[in-house]
Every structure is written in C-alpha cells, then in structure tokens.
Design a protein with these regions (language model features):
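Intrinsic disorder/low-complexity detector
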Residues: 1-114, 127, 137, 145, ...
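Long, charge-rich, low-complexity alpha-helical segments
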Residues: 312-313
Length: 337
C-alpha cells in the first residue's frame, strides 16, 4: 500500500546515552553493523512487510501465553537479554554468569524496566518452562538462569517468521542471502530455503512439544555476537514511538498487526474489527481493546469512524511506521551475519 521504506538509524552513540549502559566495556556498534545500518540501500517492500505481518498474526493470534511473553515490549527485552547473556557466558569469568542479579543489573540500570519486574518476569518464564535455574558447578551457592529448549525454539521461530519473507525477495540478493544464512544457522535440518519451516505451523504454538528442540551451535553463536548490539537494538525500538507505545501494553502490538493484516487482506483502508474480536484473538478485555484503539488513534495510526470497531480507517502512517519498524529490526537481526 506504499512505497518501500528506506533504512533509518540514529547517529552512532546517541542511543547509549538514552538507554543506559548494558554492556560495560563493549563498543556495541561494530563495523559490520555500521555498514548494514547506515548503507541506506536496504528497503522493505510491501510484499515482504505483508508476509511478515501475516506470519506474526498466524503465530500469535489466539496464543495468549506466547503473545504476552514475546510481544509486550518489556517482556520482549527481558527475553532477548536472557538469550544473549546466556550465550555470551564465559565459564572462566564469574562476572559473565547469567544470574538473576546480573540480569537485573544489566537491564534496570538502563531505565528500561525495574528490578522487581525483571524478577517477576523471570519467575513467569520459569513457571512456563522457558528457563530453569541450575547451581553453578564451580560454586553451588550461585544459581544460573538457563534458557530451555522451549525458549530457544520460540526465539528461532520468532526470528524465522520475520526473515523467511526476505529469502524470497527479488532484487535484494545481499539481504536475501543474509536472511537465508541466518535461518540456516538456526535450523536443525538446514532447511532455510525461504519456505515455511515445519515448526511454523500456526496451529502449533511455539512452546508446544512439536516445536521444542535444543539450540543449534549457530543459534548460540548468533546470539553471542548479537549481545554487544542489544543495547542499541532496544534503543532503536524505543525511537519508533508510535509502535513501541502500543507494544508496551498487553495486546497492543498484536492488535496493530491484526489491523494491518485485515487491511491487506481486504485491500481497503476501511475495515471492521469489533472489540470483541480483538478481545478474543489477543486475550484482552473489550475495554482494554477499546482503549488500545483509542491510543492508536491518538498516535495517528488509525481513525475511528464508528463505535465498537465497526468502521476503522487504517491510515497511511500505520503502514509507514511498520515499514520503518521492520526495516530497523531487520538491520539489527542481520548485522552480525
């Protein structure tokens, strides 16, 4: 519904001041990242964007647990930090061990979330089998947070839902090759050929038994190399306020995805999506759905022409915001490939 969006990235160094220091002693922006982020040649086309939106809607719609754990921005940040900090651990360096205290120190110092919320989220991840605590063999007094196969599988599937459409993109050979290479590193069967992975069954949640597999060495290596970029990655997402503001609330990002998906499917900017339908698919109350739509209107993403979601206009700014958001996310995901 709109032209391809150019890659956007803030001036190097500006995010560190805004987001705080997560990775002490590390320069998060390496040469490879700068080349990709500042080349200004990467674009996201409407077909790629629509395919990503469809993938995410198929994956998360109706899957209340996974949507809450991975789409709400604060939980997403903790999820990502756990994976990267775990992959970057050095058994010989106790300061690198992923303990609850270290996770709290890294994230709470940035101002992105509080220590109490981090502890609560860790308990939730543990309750649903995404992480477990193990005593360090070198010091039984210390408990290490360990991402389980369930968490690694959810991360691999989430990444695949974003990147698989890029593998089929014509005229973007370098980007397509990078996406295919990364998916191959995450895949156990090496089937990253741009087609849907066998685990990407929308009827099987990412945390179900069908999709659980231990992380590949390539997956861990990618997360390890991504760790120095994580601070700026979070900062980039914070700069996209029209989307991140919705993503900070339960069901907000999924609601936006469903609106864009419906508009793309119908080929019209004027759609109907009742608050009861949003409530059912996103696992939120109808009152919360109404408040999300009112917030989306305040942010300039939609215009409400009738009550109850009977006439919603998806504005061009919503497509532009999603294009810019996905472009920035793609740049970071591929920065270390």
């Amino acid at each position: 519904m709109n032209a391809a969006a150019p890659l956007k990235h803030p001036v190097p160094g500006t995010l560190r001041a805004a987001a705080g220091c997560l990775w002490e002693g590390t320069e998060p922006q390496n040469a490879a990242a700068l080349e990709i982020l500042n080349a200004g040649q990467q674009v996201i086309t409407p077909p790629v964007r629509d395919a990503v939106v469809q993938n995410l809607v198929s994956l998360f719609r109706g899957d209340y647990l996974l949507a809450r754990l991975m789409l709400e921005e604060g939980r997403f940040m903790v999820f990502q930090a756990i994976l990267c900090l775990s992959a970057a651990q050095n058994p010989e360096d106790r300061d690198s061990w992923l303990t609850l205290g270290r996770l709290q120190a890294r994230l709470s110092s940035s101002g992105l979330t509080s220590r109490n919320r981090i502890e609560a989220l860790v308990a939730i991840f543990e309750r649903y089998g995404f992480i477990e605590r193990r005593k360090a063999e070198e010091d039984l007094r210390i408990s290490i947070l360990m991402p389980t196969a369930r968490m690694w599988s959810a991360d691999a599937l989430f990444t695949e839902m974003h990147l698989s459409p890029l593998c089929r993109e014509q005229g973007q050979e370098e980007t397509s090759a990078g996406a295919s290479q990364l998916l191959a590193r995450l895949s156990h069967g090496g089937e990253a050929n741009g087609s849907s992975h066998q685990h990407a069954d929308p009827m099987a949640p990412a945390w179900s038994e069908r999709s659980i597999a231990p992380a590949t060495a390539g997956h861990r290596n990618w997360r390890r190399s991504f760790a120095p970029l994580l601070q700026d990655y979070f900062g980039m997402r914070m700069q996209h306020r029209s989307i991140s503001a919705l993503a900070e609330r339960d069901g907000g990002y999924l609601t936006l995805l469903m609106l864009l998906h419906e508009a793309a499917q119908t080929g019209s900017s004027r759609i109907q999506m009742g608050y009861e339908s949003i409530s059912e698919h996103a696992g939120i109350s109808r009152t919360h759905a109404r408040l999300l739509m009112e917030q989306a209107e305040t942010l300039g993403l939609v215009q409400l022409h009738a009550r109850g979601g009977r006439d919603i206009e998806v504005r061009q700014s919503a497509w532009d915001a999603m294009d810019s958001w996905l472009t920035g996310n793609f740049a970071y995901l591929l920065a270390t490939v």
